[in-house]
């Protein structure tokens, strides 16, 4: 057996799976090393993919030729679009998945990917020669050689779990931690730190009084994650349930705080701000009388339920006693308690936008080891790292995404430019070009780039082109078709909008909030015929195309304005400054700016402007020095 590869990926979580699939599908001889082949793509916390901004990332992964969207659609047991009451820039898909089927779907895809081999083992050392990674050594004493390595070790690096005052080494419940690897990397000058995350109890459904909870149903419309017309949701669609904590629950939780590792000094690491434990909630918001809980199924047939909103590392008896004070949980039986876990991460400002280390050539980092939290954030990073590892092996320009191209671009730019001091989670508010980064048009933004790269296949590219042509046909018809008051006013009144006083173009009527493409098409036969003609080549995705067309029509002004702003700022992206200045010697820069610029060494003026502590006056100094 030959232990020489183009690309080796360490860790088979969400980042590792995407990285390995991308590198192999692009043609690199790839090896994915995992501690347990039965946990490939494991959903370590909640059994769900997507959510606010995260759903857009999954759509982008799919548009680029990644796998997460396909796996999610195949294993979804409930699907919803979040933020429906807001504009389309905020719409975010989310799916509950069957946890076990999710793992096997990923494994099936990876095992049947050409150029990809899977090896079960634990990596304990990287081999570095002259500042370049050349291989690794495993606990079994196997030496691998590689042109590039992608580290996606998740929470396993020196992982330590906590339940009350009990501590147990591990990367996940009942799974061993990975030792020696952090130290092997750090000795080459790469800085690292510690972070913390947590997960809630898992509950036996047979012990729950569901009649005392509210139900939360999914949506059974055309929406899904993948843009491919072969992707379907075929599993049984299930309910979720909601309920609330109360003062009695909070009283018991407060009594347990002296034994809470978060409050007794046992855990020093920082946890995710936007996914706090239940004990953090009651301390931070002491006046809040209740907190909402979501009970989510772990699979199509299992009795195991996930209690979203009750992450905890309190002693197990406190967790159970508190939950018993919720009426629906009065007879609760759990499979395992909630727990917290501390783990190592590496400072992401030591990375290029390609996710390659600035310190060790051909070593890439992706996922939770970069200080992020979330399957989707990990998957997006893994995809980019896998692509660029392949490019480093075979030559070519690094593949990066700009902030106006993708949420993945925002994510990576934030990491490498600003760094992290707590687990990073993506939100729509982090993106300044939200209307350009909608969930409906990720294929329009990214598939062509992925096609020319070689990752998006011909069938995906043709689907994108067909959709693009249909959108152009519908929008152009609406711009040019004239409407006469006598022919449309009765319909407008029925639809609850003001009648026309004079003729206008159809697009002006479609801009009204009460009007949709489908309800006006019922009254305009020529438009109905045009819609049928435009979507004839892709009738399976007709609803998706009509939704995208309506968004383009109603929000075109906002889209154009945001694109114009992005293009203006793009001029600063074209001014390259990496390696041009000795920042420490430029006295006209502020002290903080000098320190930050030396540390980050930004690629462009635009990136420099996004570094915290670098002021507009500092940017003006750099512009003058650049001859601008």
Curated annotation (Swiss-Prot):
Its cofactor is FAD. Transmembrane segments: none annotated. GO terms for cellular component: cytosol. Pfam families: GIDA, GIDA_C_1st, SAM_GIDA_C. FAD binds at residues 11-16, 123, 178, 368. It comes from the Bacteria. Homodimer. Heterotetramer of two MnmE and two MnmG subunits. This is tRNA uridine 5-carboxymethylaminomethyl modification enzyme MnmG. The gene is mnmG.
